[in-house]
């Protein structure tokens, strides 16, 4: 995973290897993992502020939809696009389910979502931390690196390294936190 995020190996190859390791894991274990997930610092603040400002929020992840949907539900994110685990008889099969949400797919999802919502790419902001986020960040008006790998930080329009996700508000031009009702 780390090598793929640094851009050193192919994401699809890394993903297939990770999924194969999950063969036989029961969904009860996935549920336990969900219960233990912690949100990034500032996640609630940024999503709440963006919603107050009228943004449509989308979680585009190269991770698993099983977990991404849980996080999105906790935060009130509008939509989720992530990789689906193939589950049979209550356990992960270890086989990949296509399409894989890799860098190219992330960019396609962002472009399609903007088109579907009737907004220009000049109104799109993408936040990422790994090399597979670079294609979507490149097509957005603003690509923000969040505690990112060096390759991502070098190519981003802005970087948030010291604060939590609420620091993205500053990159959007909001110098202070927006009061949240």
Regions found by a protein language model. Give the residues of each.
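Conserved phosphoryl-transfer catalytic core
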Residues: 1-8
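C-terminal cap/substrate-recognition subdomain and adjoining C-terminal extension
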Residues: 24, 31-181
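Long, charged amphipathic helices and adjacent flexible linkers at domain junctions
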Residues: 11-17, 179
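Short, surface-exposed acidic
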Residues: 1, 27-30
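Cytosolic catalytic headpiece of P-type ATPases
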Residues: 17-20, 28-29
């Amino acid at each position: 995973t780390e090598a793929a995020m640094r851009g050193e190996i192919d994401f699809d190859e890394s993903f297939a290897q990770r999924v194969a390791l999950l063969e036989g894991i029961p969904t009860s274990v996935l549920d336990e993992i969900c219960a233990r997930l912690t949100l990034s610092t500032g996640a609630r603040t940024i999503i709440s502020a963006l919603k107050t400002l009228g943004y449509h929020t989308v979680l585009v992840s190269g991770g698993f939809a099983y977990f991404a949907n849980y996080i999105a539900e906790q935060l009130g994110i509008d939509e989720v696009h992530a990789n689906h685990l193939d589950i049979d008889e209550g356990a992960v099969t270890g086989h990949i389910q296509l399409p894989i949400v890799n860098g190219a797919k992330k960019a396609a999802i962002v472009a399609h979502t903007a088109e579907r919502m009737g907004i220009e790419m000049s109104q799109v902001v993408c936040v990422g931390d790994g090399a597979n986020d670079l294609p979507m960040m490149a097509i957005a008006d603003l690509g923000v690196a969040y505690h990112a790998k060096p390759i991502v930080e070098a190519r981003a329009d802005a970087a948030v390294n010291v604060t939590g996700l609420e620091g993205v508000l500053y990159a959007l031009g909001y110098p202070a936190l927006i009061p949240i009702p």
